[in-house]
């Protein structure tokens, strides 16, 4: 069983906040997979760190992109959010709890339960709420766990990005998978302030809490054992590191600067551009992008 500590985050228009989140956890792990959704600005220096695999994508799957590398990973898989600060013992604590339960449960610090189904609102109908920012006095099993503070071993849970059929509801899809596969999600005891919040202008909760019809319909289907609603996809699953399928996400001016040695070239690492294999950095990705841009 692999002991590799793999941290994963998908970020959308929160570069400054993302940097703070990464700074809080980078010394606690072996690998960090970072997806920048619809990013066309500067690349901060921390994303050239040897531990970081940087990927560019559109935003068609939103927060689900933190699970993009799951089916290619072996070890303890931790998913984080770009608006949270993690304590120095966070990874150690989460992995210790996984081991305490024999790596048979998904661990989280955030979750919700519903007393019965059908519910009228995924965001507003919960009868029990456990927040990562507040104290949770004892371990409790939850129906839906927060993926911003989640940890499990890949021997327990491994699925492809196709499983996430709609964006910005990763908590719901993981809840579905765990129910179908009889995996308990355990929201762990922790004190208030263990996780700290970086204030944001907008959040997924702000965007979705008053428009959660799809989340509600899916949650009801899961727990009433009914077919899932038909979910149309206007786009293919986003593919990272390949220009021909994500042309709108590339800032060519910035890539030109990098390619011409104006920005952090010495801090890049080799990238595997085969999407079916695990990326390992940034340098070859930039070179391939520039090659295609120049018609090579």
Segments from the language model and where they lie:
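C-terminal catalytic/acceptor-binding lobe
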Residues: 163-279, 283-296
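Short loop->beta transition adjacent to catalytic acidic/histidine clusters or analogous donor-positioning motifs
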Residues: 3-5, 25-34, 52, 75
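Short beta-strand-to-loop acidic/aromatic patch adjacent to the donor-nucleotide binding site
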Residues: 75-85
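Active-site-proximal specificity loops/subdomain of glycosyltransferases
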Residues: 37-73
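Conserved catalytic core of nucleotide-sugar-dependent glycosyltransferases
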Residues: 87, 93-159
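Short beta-strand/turn micro-motifs composed of small residues
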Residues: 9-11, 36-38, 189
């Amino acid at each position: 069983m692999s002991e590799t500590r793999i941290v994963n985050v998908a970020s959308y228009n929160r570069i400054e906040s993302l940097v703070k989140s990464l700074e809080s956890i980078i010394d606690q792990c072996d690998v960090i997979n970072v997806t920048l959704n619809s990013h066309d600005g500067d690349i901060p220096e921390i994303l050239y760190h040897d531990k970081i695999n940087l990927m560019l994508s559109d935003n068609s799957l939103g927060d689900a992109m933190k699970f993009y590398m799951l089916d290619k990973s072996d070890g303890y898989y931790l998913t984080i959010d770009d608006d949270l600060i993690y304590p120095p013992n966070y990874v150690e604590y989460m992995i210790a709890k996984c081991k305490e339960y024999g790596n048979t449960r998904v661990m989280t610090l955030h979750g919700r339960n519903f007393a019965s189904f059908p519910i009228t609102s995924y965001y507003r109908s919960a009868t029990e709420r456990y927040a990562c920012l507040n104290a949770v006095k004892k371990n409790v099993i939850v129906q839906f766990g927060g993926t911003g503070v989640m940890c499990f071993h890949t021997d327990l849970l491994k699925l492809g990005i196709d499983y996430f059929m709609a964006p910005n509801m990763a908590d719901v899809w993981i809840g579905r998978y765990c129910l179908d596969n009889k995996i308990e999600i355990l929201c762990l005891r922790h004190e208030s302030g263990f996780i700290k919040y970086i204030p944001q202008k907008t959040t997924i909760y702000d965007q979705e809490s008053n428009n959660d019809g799809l989340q509600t319909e899916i949650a009801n289907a899961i727990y009433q054992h009914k077919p899932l609603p038909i979910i149309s996809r206007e786009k293919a699953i986003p593919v990272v590191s390949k220009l021909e399928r994500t042309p709108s996400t590339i800032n060519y001016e910035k890539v030109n600067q990098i390619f011409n040695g104006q920005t952090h070239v010495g801090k890049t690492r080799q990238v595997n551009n085969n999407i079916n294999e695990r990326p390992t950095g940034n340098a070859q990705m930039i070179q391939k992008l520039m090659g295609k841009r120049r018609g090579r």
